Design a protein with these regions (language model features):
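Cytosolic catalytic domains that perform sulfur/thiol-centered chemistry
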Residues: 1-395
């Protein structure tokens, strides 16, 4: 949690990011020389170091709340905000404690599995991974013909082969690497998006407690935690424990997407795509020919291309502060009281944004799995738009 109205700005950003980028981040967060700034953390030390660094950077009016968040939160009369499902987004230090056999807050109470997720790159897992992790290929959960989720029967076989039951606590993470969006399989470099894709499908299947490692592999390494090369094999289970899908409402298909479009006051079909994709300048993918957008959608942004999510992540690849995400959505009319479905090309970026809404406790939120790939194949029955939208609202 955090003090209501506080701005998230980790001390680490001030010490590891170069000057021009720090200046941009400070301005973006509203930390400017003409404002009085009060810094707090979990204790007085971090707040003091943060304040000293801001003064060095030319922000003269910085004070500290030395008692820290713990003292504030202990007083029930003081306002505190937090993610409704904050335990589903786990910190690398929390994971390290669990792997060491400790019992931090929200520790798994039953079976627990950790998965290194990517699209078709088992050698990445073999090179090294977080200790104790198993490998999960998104191909096992998606149909390569259209990159949508597999059939209930196929998903049942896949999760049982991985040792997952409905009651297993699952933590997923990915590894992001640099590459070219025009290469044959650029999705192989987008490990953290792949992890959220797996998470969404597991939630759809019915896994009760599935979580994401914030910042993924990269943040684990940056925090100084160890890696291993030992390749572990899963222990299959005989039964998942329920008929899949337990939560069919997590995913909508074509007819439901059209129903959402038919109710612009009470629903929103949100395009998690780049502005160039939205305008119809590019399709965004080397395997999708048509360019454009679904007529009547709402632009929700993503990042620089189909394999990056900078608009929803911090500079260190962790989740962007959720009040900022919520505020951007609200400006575009994307709110928790509506039936909201996110779409992209085939569901990866949409899965990450779905997860962020899910973390905030949104109840009627889904992924339109077919996305632009499915919609664009039938322009006669599926209306398409290109060019500047008449409604300029966007997240």
């Amino acid at each position: 949690g955090h003090i209501r109205g506080a701005v998230a700005f980790p001390l680490d950003w001030l010490t590891t990011i170069d000057g021009p980028e720090v200046a941009r981040l400070l301005a973006e967060k509203g930390l400017t020389a003409d404002r009085e700034i009060v810094a707090y953390g979990t204790g007085a030390g971090d707040a003091a170091a943060f304040a000293d660094r801001l003064v060095e950077l030319g922000l003269p009016t910085v004070r500290t709340f030395d008692a820290g968040f713990g003292a504030w939160a202990a007083d029930s009369t003081l306002p505190v905000d937090k993610l409704v499902r904050h335990d589903r987004l786990v910190h690398v230090d929390w994971l390290a404690q669990v792997l060491a056999g400790e019992r931090p807050e929200a520790a798994p109470s039953g079976p627990f599995l950790l998965f290194h997720v990517n699209f078709g790159v088992p050698e990445e897992y073999a090179e090294n991974h977080i200790p104790g992790a198993l490998y999960l290929d998104t191909n096992w959960l998606e149909n390569p013909a259209d990159w949508n989720r597999r059939s209930p029967e196929e998903l049942d076989r896949a999760v049982r082969a991985l040792g997952i039951t409905r009651d297993t606590t699952v933590v997923v993470y990915g590894r992001d690497t640099e590459g070219d969006a025009n290469e044959k399989w650029p999705g192989r470099r987008a490990g953290q998006i792949a992890a959220t894709r797996a998470l969404m499908i597991l939630r759809y299947a019915g896994v009760e407690d599935v979580r994401l490692l914030d910042g993924g592999y990269d943040w684990w390494v940056r925090a100084g935690h160890p890696l291993e090369t030992f390749q572990r094999e899963p222990t299959p289970v005989g039964s998942f424990g329920a008929a899949i899908p337990v939560r069919p409402d997590v995913i909508v298909d074509l007819d439901e997407a059209k129903a959402i479009l038919a109710d612009p006051e009470g629903a929103a079909l949100v395009s998690v795509r780049t502005w160039r994709e939205h305008l119809g300048n590019v399709s965004g993918y080397n395997y999708i020919g048509p360019a454009g957008r679904i007529a009547g959608d709402v632009w929700g942004n993503c990042g620089s291309d189909a394999y990056h999510m900078q608009h929803y992540r911090n500079i260190d690849n962790t989740m962007r502060a959720y009040p900022e995400i919520t505020a951007n959505w609200a400006e575009a009319g994307i709110t928790a009281d509506k039936w909201v479905a996110f779409y992209c090309g085939t569901g990866w970026r949409a899965s990450e944004t779905w997860f962020y809404a899910y973390l905030q406790g949104w109840e009627r939120v889904a992924v339109y799995d077919g996305g632009w790939f499915e919609w664009s194949q039938d322009p006669i029955n599926n209306p398409i738009e290109i060019g500047e939208p008449l409604d300029e609202s966007a997240a």
